[in-house]
A protein has these predicted regions:
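Metallocofactor- and cofactor-centric catalytic cores in central/energy metabolism, strongly enriched
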Residues: 1-248, 252, 257-338
């Protein structure tokens, strides 16, 4: 930012650092303007990062403008390719998988089909040593007690409550209300209150202990089920999860979100069969089979877990096939921007 500091700058730098360290990137090129407040050199120092063959930086002003910048950028990326291309696939444990849990365009079926099915998949992942990140704090509001009672220790539960209180104050000073979250699409899909929405949303987290609560874009170091404080807006929320280390996004939708993510593939889970028939090209799994009576939550959870393993092994998700996600880097903008 040109004139941004404090919390907003801290969050931006943390987010950029998380992407720079992300395992789904073979190499990273960081390009700055040259006179911005978030200087590349100070960002590197603050983040504990060092330039190397697979982390290159430069700025536009020192490079002589747009054309020279593009030419230099292409040359630097090409120089990374030989080392990046040496990487070979090899068998590894599911413990290396970190899923970012998302829901967007929720409906009245979300809490009884796709969300609990995703929760069942989360339980399987956690049993294999993996990690799942629940986020979208405003959509936990009113159901936080279901999470605090699962906290591994008192401090974890208290940190979640502190983040809820922060959101109450944050929305108040900005003229909003925490209890008025459902969107027009949510209401058209049968959700009328934040409590209905939140009770369904927390089902994505399965049944295991809540092991840690993180602030936005903080590195997730704890294995198991954790929570990261983010807004409910999907691109901002997922950006924080990816910065924290999520290498796959599992996204439930009842109304038909076509969201995609990069560098972490997004697996789309339809809550109802009508949506599946309408947008099959965007959806990866039809959790509406639970509502139809042709599959159980546990069976669908196993199917989701199997797809997570397949996508982690290189099978492209529907949103990847469409090329979605290249424009979905949206850090949370906090504080004054002058």
């Amino acid at each position: 930012g040109m004139a941004s500091e404090g919390l907003g700058m801290d969050v931006l730098r943390r987010t950029l650092a998380g992407y720079a360290c992300h395992p789904n990137f073979a190499g990273v090129l960081v390009v700055g303007l040259g006179c911005e407040g978030n200087q590349i050199s100070s960002w590197l120092d603050a983040s504990g990062l060092q330039e190397g063959q697979l982390l290159q930086t430069f700025n536009i002003q020192d490079s002589g403008g747009t054309r020279h910048t593009v030419e230099k950028g292409i040359a630097l990326v090409n120089a990374m390719l030989p080392q990046a291309n040496q990487v070979q696939r090899e068998p590894c444990s599911a413990a290396h998988i970190t899923i970012g849990l998302q829901c967007g365009g929720s409906d009245g079926y979300s809490g009884i089909s796709a969300n609990p099915a995703l929760g069942a998949a989360v339980d399987l992942l956690v049993a294999h040593g993996g990690t799942a990140i629940l986020s979208e704090t405003p959509e936990v509001y009113g159901a936080e007690h279901l999470l605090t009672r699962r906290a591994v220790k008192r401090e974890v539960g208290e940190k979640l409550v502190q983040r809820i209180r922060w959101w109450e104050e944050y929305t108040r000073i900005n003229g909003g209300e925490m209890n008025n979250n459902p969107s027009p699409g949510n209401k058209a899909g049968g959700l009328t209150t934040i409590l209905e929405k939140s009770l369904g949303a927390v089902a994505k987290g399965g049944t295991t202990n809540l092991r840690a609560v993180y602030e936005y874009a903080e590195p997730v170091t704890e294995h198991g089920f954790v929570l990261m404080d983010t807004p409910g807006y999907d691109p901002v929320s997922a950006t924080g999860q990816v910065a924290g280390g999520a290498n796959i996004i599992c996204f439930t939708t009842g109304r038909g979100s076509a969201y995609g993510c990069a560098p972490s593939p997004s697996i789309k889970l339809a809550t109802n069969s009508a949506l599946w028939k309408r947008q099959e090209e965007d959806m990866d799994i039809n959790c509406g089979e639970i509502v139809d009576g042709s599959a159980s939550v546990e069976q669908m959870g196993q199917l989701i877990f199997d797809m997570v393993l397949a996508v982690a092994s290189g099978e492209p998700s529907k949103s990847e096939r469409h090329g979605y996600g290249q424009n979905e880097f949206v850090p949370w903008q906090l504080g004054a921007v002058m």
